[in-house]
Amino acid sequence: MWDPNKYLAFADHRGRPFYELLSRVDARSPRRVVDLGCGPGNLTVSLAERWPDAVLEASDSSPEMVEAARERGLDAGRQDVRDWTPKPDTDVVVSNAALQWVPEHRELLRRWPTQLPSGAWIAVQVPGNFDAPSHTIVRDLASRERWSRSLPDVPFRASTVVDDPADYAGLLADAGCAVDAWETTYVQRLTGENPVLEWITGTALRPVKDALSAPEWDLFREELAPLLDEAYPRRPDGSTFFPFRRIFVVAQVQ
């Protein structure tokens, strides 16, 4: 279950990649703008502000996120991105930090250009940090005998979940698009107790939390916290640097 409040705890850090992604989309007067994986809608509303004359279509697979987006006045619907098909007037498709959850996302990126009108834009951002300590430590802890019996079916993600920018660029170029792809590592300054643990609780640890009972979840967090604190030590000023690699691709259908 997604927790919109937990996700929004780091809204500024999560928002910056979205705005940098959209800065490369040069759509002037799109008819329909689509946000796939809109989350709680806090970033989606900026699409309406940028393109006020466009029809804004937003969806997410999480009912909690859809409810939060609707509370912001968005006409959001619950939908699996794999089931989405663009309407004929779709001129901009945005997916920010969502497709890493979809194993078939490469096939979607091949398919969408064949379904979109000429001149349409596709803008995608995915995390590229699955080999970072924030992920490897979780996978290691979950594999220990104490936890492996409780977490046999949790889909822990490795670096193969997403591709490098050049791979996405090639995929979309082969699909007939003009492509702009890049990566950025944000050295994020976090504050508070166990800030990296709090960050991943809203995303990477969600399947773990869903699989455990409340007492087990508390114990897992208790064991995980010092391991993350060692990998991401607190600085003398009380802050913690959390490097986070992200992958971007913007494509225009030719």
From Swiss-Prot:
User: Where in or outside the cell?
Assistant: Cytoplasm
Please give the catalytic activity noted in the UniProt record: trans-aconitate + S-adenosyl-L-methionine = (E)-3-(methoxycarbonyl)pent-2-enedioate + S-adenosyl-L-homocysteine
Q: Which GO terms describe its cellular component?
A: cytoplasm
Q: Which UniProt keywords apply?
A: Cytoplasm, Methyltransferase, S-adenosyl-L-methionine, Transferase
Identify a single GO molecular function assigned to this protein. trans-aconitate 2-methyltransferase activity
Pfam families per UniProt: Methyltransf_23
The biological processes this protein is annotated with in GO are:
methylation
UniProt EC number: 2.1.1.144
KW Cell membrane (keyword) present = no
| Coarse class of the protein's main subcellular location | cytoplasm
* Domain of life where this protein originates: Bacteria
Q: Does the keyword Cytoplasm apply?
A: yes
Annotated HAMAP family? Tran_acon_Me_trans
Family as reported in the entry's similarity comment: Belongs to the methyltransferase superfamily. Tam family.
Describe the function of this protein. Catalyzes the S-adenosylmethionine monomethyl esterification of trans-aconitate.
Return the PANTHER family for the record: TRANS-ACONITATE 2-METHYLTRANSFERASE, TRANS-ACONITATE 2-METHYLTRANSFERASE-RELATED
Q: What is this protein called?
A: Trans-aconitate 2-methyltransferase
Q: List the source organism.
A: Rhodococcus jostii (strain RHA1)
By which gene is this protein encoded? tam
